[in-house]
Amino acid sequence: MTVVSVLATLALAQPLGASQNPWATLHRPLHLSRLAPGAACPVSPVDRRIDWTRINIFGGSGIGRGPVYPGLGGSGGHFDARPDDQYGGPWAGGKVFWYVRPSYRGRVLIRGRRLDGPQSLGFNGRVLPDRELRIHNYSVSWSGQPSGSRGIPSSVRVRASGCYGVQIDGSTFSRVVVFTVTAP
């Protein structure tokens, strides 16, 4: 009986070093390439497998391979940032809608930076933006939302025009999405 109790306890115990933070496993090393200043920006294309008109997300068409897509506004891989009228300072930004296909049900972690310069990219926040965006297992709802899909709006904030990339990490994937930004 004692051996069975010990084995049961070991089976339920977490491995050494396992984190209580459910987001820790999504904090993979960033694999965002650096570009030389003036190099062509390898913008991620719109995923044509998705009927973006029917899905009706704020932000138009999603770019990248999925299962998580940013809707940057318009129909492609360009984001127009506006001055930060709410908090002021050097950051500019705008609304981006993040669409999650019904085929993926887990958490999502998004981080990014400028690829052709030293500037960072942030999300939401106040005077200073947050360094990452977390998409939980719940969603806002919208007209045309496919059953089982999720999505959240966020503010994406930058300090300069250029070529930017975000790394989108889920439990079963890691994707990079690249887009251009025009900032004031």
Task: List each model region and its residues.
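Secretory targeting and sorting signals
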Residues: 1-18
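Contiguous segments within soluble domain cores/interaction surfaces
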Residues: 19-159, 169-170, 174-184
